[in-house]
């Protein structure tokens, strides 16, 4: 497999690709993934023994309840009760990590009551993607692997295996029809090869304007991608400020996501970046989102000479020197998570409270005396929640307790992972175990799904970053309930539309055979 056959963001080697399967070739369809899925930027682990237990329990419980409700297993698992069943199975295997009770799984009305509880919750997804209509790189189809191997998709086989999976129509369905997402930030990525740009800066803004005009409300916001060290890169910054007027900037300090790139750079490069910060602040576009962490297992070789640019050792000084600039660190800088075994990562944390690269990020506010550094959860929440929920709770808990609940923002990296609804449900239900709280000396629990901490993470922190008046959010949510997207969603559901549970990525090959649900 050549580099140009590889999907977006993929940094794994040819041998590592040979160890993976397409999700739509190898998976039990579950509301929540039952094994780790990668978007290609890191290596997926084989299904663990505990994940196999979870899958077995989901099947067993779902078969029983589906029969009782005169439904097929697949139909049952597409309901809210099916989602609750998956969380019950996870709690049986991992301990009580998620807030759920048996009534939700057994009683479709009880599951509906929970859904009503969260109606109108403001959820701002700080990292979403789709591709332009004329994108021709078929290698992107490798991302289809996630859903089935992760066991999440009742109907993925009904979606043609074409690039349409990643285009705008399916994006709108997955994000706004099949999840509780209120507002989405549309992102992109730079590549040394211009053919691999997913969306141009113009396309990002045009998409946002089109959707918002159709909706009659602000449902989408957009980045402009910056490319430090590219020839004449500041000319594009000037054009974006004058013509495009993005809400924030996005870039990769490693340069090209395929790496290694001749355009790798640092946030604290005074000659290169400080003139940009000055210009951005003057223009009132003072938030920059930076890909950090999330590297493949062989990052030291694959990104030789540039991998250190994916660490956070350039964040503190830049944030201190530019207090008016907001630095949103995508993937919370988590290194190639679970590069070996899940229990090794958790054992390391239990021993010394350290999570590679992410803890370095969490310590920046206190170490540098800054309050303008944020952690974003795209991809890393999804992969940790389904592989080791206890680790996930420690990971999120550390960010909340060291950085503060005002400095953690929600993101899912969808549409690569399909509908983000299961991630939303997992975050609503997740709590930090008391023994971790006590040992780490933490004071802040995650709390209720609509409590102060989770409401901040889900949307209020990003509302502040992107200049949406937080005091008007409640009123805005009511307007979202009556805009065109809300009307389309109501009609979609009334006609029997249901979440496909599709996701598009990579799973590890571990002897699985395709199962029809």
What feature does the model see in each segment?
Residues 190-310:
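Active-site gating/metal-coordination segments in enzymes
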Residues 124-128, 184-186, 220-224, 249-250, ...:
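Hydrophobic faces of well-ordered beta-strands that scaffold small-molecule active sites
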Residues 71-88, 111-113, 138, 152-174, ...:
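Mid-to-C-terminal alpha-helical segments outside catalytic/metal-binding sites
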Residues 140, 258, 263-410, 418, ...:
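Catalytic pocket-lining loop regions of alpha/beta-barrel enzymes
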Residues 63-78, 86-111:
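N-terminal twin-arginine translocation
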């Amino acid at each position: 497999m050549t580099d140009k056959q590889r999907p977006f963001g993929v940094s794994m080697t040819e041998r590592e690709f040979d160890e993976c399967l397409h999700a739509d070739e190898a998976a039990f369809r579950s509301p929540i993934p039952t094994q780790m899925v990668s978007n290609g930027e890191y290596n997926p682990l084989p299904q663990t023994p505990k994940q196999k237990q979870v899958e077995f329990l989901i099947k067993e419980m779902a078969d029983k309840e589906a029969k009782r409700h005169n439904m097929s297993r697949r139909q049952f698992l597409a309901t809210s009760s099916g989602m609750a069943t998956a969380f019950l199975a996870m709690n049986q295997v991992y301990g009580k990590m998620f807030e759920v009770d048996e009534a939700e799984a057994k009683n479709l009305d009880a599951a509906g009551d929970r859904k009503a509880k969260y109606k109108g919750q403001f959820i701002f997804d700080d990292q979403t993607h789709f591709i332009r209509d004329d994108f021709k790189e078929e290698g992107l189809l490798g991302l289809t692997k996630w859903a089935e191997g992760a066991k999440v998709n009742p109907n993925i086989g009904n979606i043609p295996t074409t690039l349409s999976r990643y285009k705008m129509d399916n994006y709108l369905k997955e994000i706004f029809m099949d999840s509780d997402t209120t507002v989405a930030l549309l992102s992109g990525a730079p590549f040394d090869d211009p053919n691999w740009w997913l969306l141009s800066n113009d396309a990002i803004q045009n998409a946002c304007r089109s959707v918002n005009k159709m909706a009659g409300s602000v449902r989408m916001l957009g980045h402009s991608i910056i490319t430090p060290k590219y020839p004449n890169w500041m000319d594009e910054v000037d054009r974006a400020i004058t013509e495009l007027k993005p809400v924030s900037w996005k870039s990769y300090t490693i340069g090209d996501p395929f790496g290694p790139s001749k355009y790798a750079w640092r946030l604290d490069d005074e000659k290169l970046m400080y003139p940009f910060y000055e210009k951005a602040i003057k223009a009132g576009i003072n938030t920059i989102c930076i890909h950090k962490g999330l590297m493949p297992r062989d990052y030291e070789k694959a990104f030789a000479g540039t991998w250190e640019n994916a660490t956070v050792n350039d964040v503190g000084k830049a944030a201190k020197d530019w207090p008016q600039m907001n630095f949103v660190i995508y993937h919370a800088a988590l290194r190639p998570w679970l590069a070996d075994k899940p229990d090794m990562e958790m054992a390391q944390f239990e021993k010394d409270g350290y999570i590679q690269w992410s803890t370095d990020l969490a310590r920046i506010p206190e170490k540098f005396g800054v309050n303008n550094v944020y952690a974003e959860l795209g991809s890393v929440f999804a992969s940790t929640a389904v592989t080791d929920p206890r680790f996930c709770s420690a990971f999120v808990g550390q960010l909340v307790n060291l950085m503060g609940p005002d400095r953690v923002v929600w993101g899912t990296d969808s549409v690569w992972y399909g509908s983000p609804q299961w991630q939303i449900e997992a975050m609503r239900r997740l709590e930090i175990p008391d023994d971790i709280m006590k040992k780490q000396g933490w004071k802040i629990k995650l709390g209720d799904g609509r409590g102060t901490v989770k409401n901040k993470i889900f949307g209020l922190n990003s509302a502040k970053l992107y200049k949406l008046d937080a005091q008007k959010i409640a009123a805005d949510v009511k307007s979202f309930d009556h805009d065109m997207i809300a009307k389309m969603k109501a009609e979609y559901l009334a006609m029997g539309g249901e979440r496909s549970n599709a996701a598009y990525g990579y799973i590890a090959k571990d002897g699985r055979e395709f199962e029809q649900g």
